[in-house]
Amino acid sequence: MEAKAVARTIRIAPRKVRLVLDLIRGKNVGEAIAILKLTNKASSPVVEKLLMSALANAEHNYDMNTDELVVKEAYANEGPTLKRFRPRAQGRASAINKRTSHITIVVSDGKEEAKEA
């Protein structure tokens, strides 16, 4: 059985979020939370909050035991880009792309759900 949580349009570049997600993918949920608390990255609190949301979804929606859960999937896709301009020398301007992320975390207890035919 799986439970999922999604955070959309987070103002951190996906490339930076993936560094944190790579640390927790495949880990036990308790271990993943401990790793996130000690990780000194800007996306760490956002990912931790999202993981807690996935835990709450698993417990509330599917009556899963939160002690057995494992981070099955964790990925960050690119969200909409905010385009800004920075003034440069001699009247020019350069484009600055403020990137956003859509972050998804899926937790699983390792048991397969019964498929209906």
Swiss-Prot record:
Domain of life: Bacteria
GO biological process, one term: translation
SUPFAM superfamilies: Ribosomal protein L22
Molecular-function GO term, any one: rRNA binding
Gene3D superfamilies named in the record: Ribosomal protein L22/L17
GO cellular component: cytosolic large ribosomal subunit
Keyword Protein transport: no
Keywords: Ribonucleoprotein, Ribosomal protein, RNA-binding, rRNA-binding
Coiled-coil residues: none
Assembly notes: Part of the 50S ribosomal subunit.
Annotated function: This protein binds specifically to 23S rRNA; its binding is stimulated by other ribosomal proteins, e.g. L4, L17, and L20. It is important during the early stages of 50S assembly. It makes multiple contacts with different domains of the 23S rRNA in the assembled 50S subunit and ribosome. The globular domain of the protein is located near the polypeptide exit tunnel on the outside of the subunit, while an extended beta-hairpin is found that lines the wall of the exit tunnel in the center of the 70S ribosome.
Alphabetized HAMAP family for the sequence: Ribosomal_uL22_B
Family classification: Belongs to the universal ribosomal protein uL22 family.
The protein, known as: Large ribosomal subunit protein uL22
Gene name of the record: rplV
